[in-house]
């Protein structure tokens, strides 16, 4: 009854107006699943390959008809008739069919869209929400949001080199209240920027990209907004950074050009440690370049016992990269982006490896998103306790927050907001 009888992919647009892949899966009993694939702006060199057409005459080379064709032909032929509840077998069959280390033949976008649509169809067949189908009875922890309210780096045209300045409402009693707190800080920040004559247009992820002078200038604005909104920094709200340091790691130096700094890996670790001393920063993502293992080791040694150090470009949601990093003692947390690895099975494996080794996990969106809210369900399914899905603007970001609000309501008395427990042994 849960055999796959039809698969259909199409080209749709993401939140940046670029093409992406959407896949529909239909089962014998009429159950249905649909999934759309996100896309990143700052991508790690070790990510699985997002297959693009390269035809400059169409969508400026960013079309995905090759990936769509791969789903509708090769992948469909491979998995039609298989049982949608055999997720691992289906994912492994697609990976084997692709035959490359980085999914470059069929495309991670083709494989992932199919993988997630299969899971949704199987959940529909069981009459279960996706978080419950994937996570079982233990799926009841609502994640603390990392809300990206000021943008720099690759996400903005301003002098700030760090990519994201985020707030985390760790003191909220529930997910719904956490969203409210975040929204109130967001609107307070907007008012404060406007009063200073600074830009309040929003970027790809819904955050502001004002022309601020430095990292500390941005952090000061965020701190002031938290306080003006009536919350206590360090108690109600913690701060989080995504440095995206790979983007400004040049010839062995961290070129923080907006501040006129050229730092060695050790000096960069000291720079970040000083920020953690001055502000209530609980999490730093990609504080070092993706292959600067010595820098990561230095940063982990300096602040790893008190700050969550999240590997995004470092680990690219890849179980092999993650195991390498764990073995070297790099970072203490995994950023989870389903399209970095390209299948649900491998994503769940990476989260499991992280959690078994005492690393936290943070479910994450990409800068190019759609209305698909799958990652909200996966955050609850994996009990990872944290989610990074943008600011409090743009419906492609709010779709995830709204889905989490629904899940919390649906879980009722069994729902638990992770709050200050989200950081494992670090605490907040």
Swiss-Prot record:
Mg(2+) binds at residues 242, 285, 312. Gene3D superfamilies: Enolase-like C-terminal domain, Enolase-like, N-terminal domain. The keyword Secreted applies. (2R)-2-phosphoglycerate binds at residues 163, 337, 366-367, 388. Pfam families: Enolase_C, Enolase_N. Pathway: Carbohydrate degradation; glycolysis; pyruvate from D-glyceraldehyde 3-phosphate: step 4/5. The active site is at residues 205, 337. GO terms for biological process: glycolytic process. PROSITE patterns: ENOLASE. SMART domains: Enolase_C (SM01192), Enolase_N (SM01193). One of its GO terms (molecular function) is magnesium ion binding. It is found in: Cytoplasm; Secreted; Cell surface. It catalyses: (2R)-2-phosphoglycerate = phosphoenolpyruvate + H2O. Binds a second Mg(2+) ion via substrate during catalysis. Its cofactor is Mg(2+). Keywords: Cytoplasm, Glycolysis, Lyase, Magnesium, Metal-binding, Secreted. GO terms for cellular component: cell surface; extracellular region; phosphopyruvate hydratase complex. InterPro entries: Enolase, Enolase-like_C_sf, Enolase-like_N, Enolase_C, Enolase_CS, Enolase_N. It comes from the Bacteria. Its EC number is 4.2.1.11. Belongs to the enolase family. Catalyzes the reversible conversion of 2-phosphoglycerate (2-PG) into phosphoenolpyruvate (PEP). It is essential for the degradation of carbohydrates via glycolysis. This is Enolase. The lineage of its organism: Bacteria, Pseudomonadati, Pseudomonadota, Alphaproteobacteria, Sphingomonadales.
């Amino acid at each position: 009854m849960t055999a796959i009888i039809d698969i259909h992919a199409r080209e749709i647009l993401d939140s940046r107006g670029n093409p992406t892949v959407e896949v529909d899966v239909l089962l014998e009993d009429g159950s249905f699943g649909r999934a759309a694939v996100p896309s990143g702006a700052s991508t790690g060199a070790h990510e699985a390959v997002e297959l693009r057409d390269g035809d400059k005459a169409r969508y400026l080379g960013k079309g995905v008809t090759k990936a769509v064709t791969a789903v509708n032909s090769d992948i469909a032929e491979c998995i039609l008739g298989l049982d949608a509840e055999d997720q691992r077998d289906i994912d492994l069959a697609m990976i084997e069919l692709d035959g490359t280390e980085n999914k470059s033949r069929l495309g991670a976008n083709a494989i992932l869209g199919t993988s997630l649509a299969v899971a949704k169809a199987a959940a529909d067949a069981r009459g279960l929400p996706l978080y419950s189908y994937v996570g079982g009875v233990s799926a009841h922890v609502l994640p603390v949001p990392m809300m990206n309210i000021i943008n720099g780096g690759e996400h903005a045209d301003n002098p700030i080199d760090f990519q994201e300045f985020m707030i985390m409402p760790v003191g909220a009693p529930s997910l719904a209240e956490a969203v409210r707190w975040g929204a109130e800080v967001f609107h307070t920040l907007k008012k404060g920027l406007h009063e200073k004559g600074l830009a309040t247009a929003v970027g790809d992820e819904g955050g502001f990209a004002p022309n601020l002078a430095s990292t500390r200038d941005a952090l000061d604005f965020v701190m002031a907004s938290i306080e003006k909104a009536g919350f206590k920094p360090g108690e109600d709200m913690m701060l989080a950074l995504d440095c995206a340091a790979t983007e400004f790691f040049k010839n062995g130096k961290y070129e923080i050009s907006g501040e006129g700094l050229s730092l060695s890996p050790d000096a960069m670790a000291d720079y970040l440690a000083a920020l953690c001393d001055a502000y209530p920063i609980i999490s730093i993502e990609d504080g070092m370049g993706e292959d600067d293992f010595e820098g990561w080791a230095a940063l982990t040694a300096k602040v790893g016992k008190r700050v969550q150090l999240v590997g995004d470009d470092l680990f690219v949601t890849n179980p092999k990269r993650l195991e390498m990093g764990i073995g070297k003692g790099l970072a203490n947390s995994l950023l989870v982006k389903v399209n970095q690895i390209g299948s649900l099975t491998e994503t769940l494996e990476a989260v499991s490896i992280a959690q078994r080794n005492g690393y936290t996990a943070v479910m994450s969106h990409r800068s190019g998103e759609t209305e698909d809210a799958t990652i909200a369900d996966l955050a609850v399914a994996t009990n990872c306790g944290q989610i990074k899905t943008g600011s409090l603007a743009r419906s492609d970001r709010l779709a995830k927050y709204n889905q989490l609000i629904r899940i919390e309501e649906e879980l009722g008395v069994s729902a638990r907001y992770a709050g200050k427990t989200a950081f494992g042994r670090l605490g907040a």
